[in-house]
Amino acid sequence: MFCYQCSQTVRGRACTIRGVCGKEPTVARLQDNLLFAIKGISAYLYHARELGYTDEEVDAFLERGFYSTLTNVNFDAGEFIDLALEAGEMNIRTMKLLKKAHIDTYGEPEPTEVRVGALEGPAIIATGHSLRALEELLKQTEGTGINVYTHSELLPAHGYPGLRKYPHLAGQLGGPWFDQKDTFSRYTAAILGTSNCVLLPRDDYRDRMFTCGVAALPGVEHLEGYDFSPLIDKALELPPLSEEDATTLTTGFGLSTILSLADKIRELVEDGKIRRFFLVGGCDSPLPRAKYYTEFVRKLPEDTVVLTLACGKYRFNSMDLGDIEGVPRLIDLGQCNDAIVAVELVEALSNLFQMDINELPLSIILSWMEQKAAAILWSLLSLDLKGMYIGPILPGWANEDIVKFLVDNYDLTPIGDPEEDIRKILG
């Protein structure tokens, strides 16, 4: 543990073995866990509020959750487990709210092929998660000759009719969040960071990068009120991009699209042509261990279907996995907040096959990087989903007591060797 939130803290530095107040190390770690989950919920709630959607019940939980971690309020480990599970439930509620906000505003996502590569002309690259910021940027760049490209978690924006209607939404440049320094250095474009997943910029593009909303970087101009005039002016000043050879990615598989295939999916499963579904995704990590997810998907047999979401998909979304009688073997469900689509899909499959969720031909292979993934993990645990795999490493705040609880109650398993894990899952 490491706690220094009150004046009693040991030597005025930190309590690292046991709190002077009596707080046990596991309680301290569970408090951290709750705060991480609350941070994740707050990110999704922020983006819903951008579009005018709020939830008083979620707001009230955030107040109670934060308050519970104050000094001398709650010393009960079991209560903090319950609060973490409640945080998972509140995160599901928040993701549903954000999904409604996105669909009400931009329409139901549709499968869409996205160009990956530059076109000739001045350019702006938008990174992060804010569809609202992207929409305002597209409005303000109409008729300017500027091509707007998405990066990382804004890729799914191309699937929304209300955003795809802008012809100058030109495609995608780069991949996951951690490639941005190379991507932004490579292209002479103006850059907009709209949310989390921005990195401290290199000097060679710092003067052409801007932030908005919650994002902020030292030495980078922050734009208030969605007024992107300085960003647009910078894009027009810079040398235009040259057209380059391009590839394509497919995104935009909303729940309704998948449910339209329900009868065919049931037929293929009952006929043994689809053996199992694998939900492989989450936050990507630059750790070498994250190569596991690439190898895992590459080694899956051809009678399996891969569902993916968030930036973890960049580990394998360029693979051509083909289809099984018209059902794509690789289905991109969207951003990390679109984990709600995965949750709803699990429930839909349970109804389709009249099975308990833990009896479904479905395995979940999670990758995590930061606090939003912690919120999503507790969302899945709140549904009593068992047998999930998690990587690239176990969360650092989970000590032996917490790991034992997760293993004993939910059969949560650290990723191992891809081939061995597949063999174990498929029997």
From Swiss-Prot:
Q: List UniProt keywords, sorted A-Z.
A: 4Fe-4S, Cytoplasm, Iron, Iron-sulfur, Metal-binding, Oxidoreductase
Cofactors required? [4Fe-4S] cluster; hybrid [4Fe-2O-2S] cluster
EC supergroup of this enzyme:
oxidoreductase
Q: Which one GO biological process term can you cite for this protein?
A: response to hydrogen peroxide
What does the note accompanying the cofactor annotation read? Binds 1 [4Fe-4S] cluster.
Locate the residues binding [4Fe-4S] cluster.
Answer: C3, C6, C15, C21
Q: Which reaction does it catalyse?
A: A + NH4(+) + H2O = hydroxylamine + AH2 + H(+)
Query: What EC number is given for this enzyme?
Result: 1.7.99.1
Gene Ontology CC, one term: cytoplasm
Q: Give the binding site residues for hybrid [4Fe-2O-2S] cluster.
A: H129, E153, C197, C283, C311, C336, E370, K372
Show the CDD domains listed in the entry.
Answer: HCP
Q: Name one GO molecular function term.
A: peroxidase activity
Q: What does this protein do?
A: Catalyzes the reduction of hydroxylamine to form NH(3) and H(2)O.
The similarity annotation says: Belongs to the HCP family.
PANTHER family named in the record: HYDROXYLAMINE REDUCTASE
**Known NCBIfam families for this protein?**
hybrid_clust, PRK05290.1
Descriptive protein name = Hydroxylamine reductase
